[in-house]
Amino acid sequence: MKPLALHGHERNITQIKYNRMGDLLFSAAKDTRPTVWYSLNGERLGTYNGHGGAVWCIDVNYDTTQFISGGADNCLRLWDCEKGVTLSKIETKSAVRTCGFSYGGNEIMLSTDRQMGQSCRILIFDVRDNMESPILTIPVDNSKVTAGLWGPLDQFLVTGHENGELCQWDVKSGNKLISVQEHSKQINDIQMYKDSTMFVTASKDTTAKLFDTDSLRHLKTYKTDRPVNSAALSPIKDHVVVGGGQEAMEVTTTSTRVGKFDARFFHVVFEEEIGRVKGHFGPINSLAFHPDGRSYSSGGEDGYVRIHSFDPSYDDIEFEY
C-alpha cells in the first residue's frame, strides 16, 4: 500500500475532508490557506486565500458548490468552491473551532472558543440571507465545544466538549436535549457513519468510542495507548480507523515508532485491532475515509496529507459472525 504524500502546507494539518463524490479532498492547516486536491492522483487544484490565522475547521456542501472554513483570525468564510473567492464572511469575537453545513445546505453551524474574556457559543446562520446575523445562538456555559456536527435531517446538533462531555442540541429552540459523559478528557473529533445512525468520537483519554446518534447511547470502545486525535468509520466494511499520537511537545525523540504515530484499524463490532499503517512523522491530526471505502486519507503534525489506497487483498478480510 504505497501512499500519495501531498505537501502543500507549511504547518501542521488541522482537518481534512472529502466531498460527497470523493473526487476532491480538502485540507486545512495552521498556515492560513485551505487547499483542495484531486483525490485520485494527489494533484493540487488550488488554495483558498484570505484567512489571517490558523484554520481550525472546514466543510464542503452536498453538491460541492460552496466551502466554509473557520479559523483563529476570529472569522468564518464562505467560499465559492470552484472559483476560490469569498462569498461571505462572519466575524466572531473569538476563534472559530468547529463548523459544518447542514444536509440541506441552507444552514451553517459554527462554534467559538472560550478565550479573551468571551464565552463559548454555538451559532447557526442561514446561507440564503447573506449571514448577517445568526438565526440561533446557543451559549455554552460549562466546557467549550471542541468537535461538532449536524444530526440526521438537520433536527439537532451533536457536540463534543473539552471535559469529555457529549451533548445533543435542538436546532429550533437551542435547548440541550441529552448530555452524556463517556470520555474523561477532551473530545478531539466526531465523525458520522454514512447513514447517520451512529458516530465515532476520538478523545485525549486514549479511546475512540461508537455512539448511537439519536440516544447518544455508548455502543463500543476502541482502546489505544496514546491520545486519539481522529477516528473515521468505513462506509463499506465494519472497520474504524483511529489516529493520534503523543502531543508534539511531549515527544522527546524523533523516532516514528517511539511516538506511536501509526493509524490503527479496529473491527467495529469486536473492538479488535486488525491492522496498522505507518508513515507520518508526528501525530495524526485528522482522518477521513473516501466515500467509496477503497481508500482513506490522513493529515498529520508533519504538514503532509497522505492518501492510502487499499490493496486488492483488503477485500478478502472477512470476519464470520
UniProtKB/Swiss-Prot annotation:
<feature type="repeat" description="WD 2">
    <location>
        <begin position="50"/>
        <end position="89"/>
    </location>
</feature>
<feature type="repeat" description="WD 4">
    <location>
        <begin position="182"/>
        <end position="221"/>
    </location>
</feature>
<dbReference type="InterPro" id="IPR015943">
    <property type="entry name" value="WD40/YVTN_repeat-like_dom_sf"/>
</dbReference>
<comment type="function">
    <text>Component of the eukaryotic translation initiation factor 3 (eIF-3) complex, which is involved in protein synthesis of a specialized repertoire of mRNAs and, together with other initiation factors, stimulates binding of mRNA and methionyl-tRNAi to the 40S ribosome. The eIF-3 complex specifically targets and initiates translation of a subset of mRNAs involved in cell proliferation.</text>
</comment>
<dbReference type="GO" id="GO:0002183">
    <property type="term" value="P:cytoplasmic translational initiation"/>
</dbReference>
<dbReference type="GO" id="GO:0033290">
    <property type="term" value="C:eukaryotic 48S preinitiation complex"/>
</dbReference>
<dbReference type="GO" id="GO:0071541">
    <property type="term" value="C:eukaryotic translation initiation factor 3 complex, eIF3m"/>
</dbReference>
<comment type="subunit">
    <text>Component of the eukaryotic translation initiation factor 3 (eIF-3) complex.</text>
</comment>
<feature type="repeat" description="WD 5">
    <location>
        <begin position="279"/>
        <end position="318"/>
    </location>
</feature>
<keyword id="KW-0853">WD repeat</keyword>
<dbReference type="GO" id="GO:0003723">
    <property type="term" value="F:RNA binding"/>
</dbReference>
<dbReference type="InterPro" id="IPR001680">
    <property type="entry name" value="WD40_rpt"/>
</dbReference>
<dbReference type="GO" id="GO:0001732">
    <property type="term" value="P:formation of cytoplasmic translation initiation complex"/>
</dbReference>
<protein>
    <recommendedName>
        <fullName>Eukaryotic translation initiation factor 3 subunit I</fullName>
    </recommendedName>
</protein>
<dbReference type="InterPro" id="IPR036322">
    <property type="entry name" value="WD40_repeat_dom_sf"/>
</dbReference>
<keyword id="KW-0963">Cytoplasm</keyword>
<keyword id="KW-0677">Repeat</keyword>
<keyword id="KW-0396">Initiation factor</keyword>
<dbReference type="GO" id="GO:0003743">
    <property type="term" value="F:translation initiation factor activity"/>
</dbReference>
<dbReference type="InterPro" id="IPR027525">
    <property type="entry name" value="eIF3i"/>
</dbReference>
<feature type="repeat" description="WD 1">
    <location>
        <begin position="8"/>
        <end position="47"/>
    </location>
</feature>
<dbReference type="GO" id="GO:0016282">
    <property type="term" value="C:eukaryotic 43S preinitiation complex"/>
</dbReference>
<comment type="similarity">
    <text>Belongs to the eIF-3 subunit I family.</text>
</comment>
<feature type="repeat" description="WD 3">
    <location>
        <begin position="140"/>
        <end position="179"/>
    </location>
</feature>
<keyword id="KW-0648">Protein biosynthesis</keyword>
<dbReference type="Pfam" id="PF24805">
    <property type="entry name" value="EIF3I"/>
</dbReference>
